[in-house]
């Protein structure tokens, strides 16, 4: 079996590529990083370090690589003969790789029409559907018809902490032990692709929301509260008992929303929260706070990790969620000068106040009780700075 994987970065090598290789695929990485592509070609293997209580090493073998800029024709041929195509490139790169994927599919259809699955493993909702929309704009009319018949674009949710890192060996990558790869089956063509460690689900929605309202919510709180106390990493911040309690409180609140909405077992979800807290406190990882906190305007969005669970909590329980409110207030104080969104956010607050920022970016009415609560918490945090 052959898998073509776009994105030979840390997530591509340390998560998706390693699982595909373990599942029996010959993995062809596609990237524009000349050094990484050259080393993967030369060695055909790389090392993954699992940073748990005890450090483990795994060797990923039987891999190769292509440069999508200088070896475009080879990438097209690889797609034409692939059994699976996956990506881990970042949402903004999906439209960039769409033309070569489309060309590969057109070439494939001239040779055979065997089923193919495409899975975009991106930190976004509906990533594969988004990729499909970009791909079809580059297909012929006949190609579009054959895509509907022969290619299954499967949405997925992925979760593994792969921190920023610098290794002596450019191919080596450190990852946390935990991972989750949930793949939605509704667009499957024939049998689901064999992927060791992935689980296939009929409805991805609850899995995406569970991750967003737990992992992303908790991560954001630790980062924004940690930034206020000038901690460098999430792991350092989580050693602060006050920050840890605030994170746990917020996850109890978002957890109450999830349990109520989806009818989940409360104890099972509590266990998931405990696992998540354990991931944030893993001493073998170093999660840079500024990296986790970046893009605060996006993270303040009405459907994102802080405002969405806070609004739903208030709607369901008619109480203000104090932990989530703390997280939103801390986000509004994030003023990292190297972050364009942080700069824009601070300018909005200066011009329109906290209420103006929450109306503009979070989609809240300025009379909403959450706005009042966040404003109070914001003032309190300002005094403590």
Swiss-Prot record:
It holds the Pfam family Mannitol_dh. GO terms for biological process: mannitol catabolic process. Keywords: NAD, Oxidoreductase. Its EC number is 1.1.1.17. Signal peptide: none annotated. Disulfide bonds: none annotated. It is an enzyme of class 1 (oxidoreductase). One of its GO terms (molecular function) is mannitol-1-phosphate 5-dehydrogenase activity. It catalyses: D-mannitol 1-phosphate + NAD(+) = beta-D-fructose 6-phosphate + NADH + H(+). PANTHER family: ALTRONATE OXIDOREDUCTASE-RELATED, MANNITOL-1-PHOSPHATE 5-DEHYDROGENASE. This is Mannitol-1-phosphate 5-dehydrogenase.
